[in-house]
Amino acid sequence: MHGPRETLQEIVLHLEPQNELDPVDLLCYEQLSESEEENDEADGVSHAQLPARRAEPQRHKILCVCCKCDGRIELTVESSAEDLRTLQQLFLSTLSFVCPWCATNQ
């Protein structure tokens, strides 16, 4: 600064725009050690993968038809969403229900 007030030329001495045509190398050249396993248990906590906890079962109401008399059957099941999907696949294939009346009379 050469006077009582600074000027823009004194503050900004040299600015050049970045050349956007030159590629920037973003690769990491870090090399890992030969051992695949690292023992990082200094705090006494094991960081091993634990199996996922199963979802809590929920109740589902299923309305279906008797395969003999076409009567309405209402079922209530308690299962996880995954098991309910399996049951749905059985319904779409060969599983059929028989109502209590048809089961005892035929």
UniProtKB/Swiss-Prot annotation:
Pfam families hit by this protein: E7
Localization per record: Host cytoplasm; Host nucleus
Zinc finger (unnamed): 66-102
InterPro entries: Papilloma_E7 (IPR000148)
Modification after translation: Highly phosphorylated.
Region (E7 terminal domain): 1-50
GO (cellular component) term, any one: host cell cytoplasm
Sequence ranges of Acidic residues compositional bias: 33-43
One of the record's GO molecular function terms: DNA-binding transcription factor activity
Keyword terms, alphabetized: Activator, DNA-binding, Early protein, G1/S host cell cycle checkpoint dysregulation by virus, Host cytoplasm, Host nucleus, Host-virus interaction, Inhibition of host innate immune response by virus, Inhibition of host interferon signaling pathway by virus, Interferon antiviral system evasion, Metal-binding, Modulation of host cell cycle by virus, Oncogene, Transcription, Transcription regulation, Viral immunoevasion, Zinc, Zinc-finger
UniProt motif LXCXE motif: location: 26-30
GO BP terms in the entry: DNA-templated transcription; symbiont-mediated perturbation of host cell cycle G1/S transition checkpoint; symbiont-mediated suppression of host innate immune response; symbiont-mediated suppression of host type I interferon-mediated signaling pathway
UniProt motif (Nuclear export signal) ranges: 84-92
HAMAP family associated with the record: PPV_E7 (MF_04004)
Assembly notes: Homodimer. Homooligomer. Interacts with host RB1; this interaction induces dissociation of RB1-E2F1 complex thereby disrupting RB1 activity. Interacts with host EP300; this interaction represses EP300 transcriptional activity. Interacts with protein E2; this interaction inhibits E7 oncogenic activity. Interacts with host TMEM173/STING; this interaction impairs the ability of TMEM173/STING to sense cytosolic DNA and promote the production of type I interferon (IFN-alpha and IFN-beta).
Entry domain remark: The E7 terminal domain is an intrinsically disordered domain, whose flexibility and conformational transitions confer target adaptability to the oncoprotein. It allows adaptation to a variety of protein targets and exposes the PEST degradation sequence that regulates its turnover in the cell.
Protein name per the record: Protein E7
Gene: E7
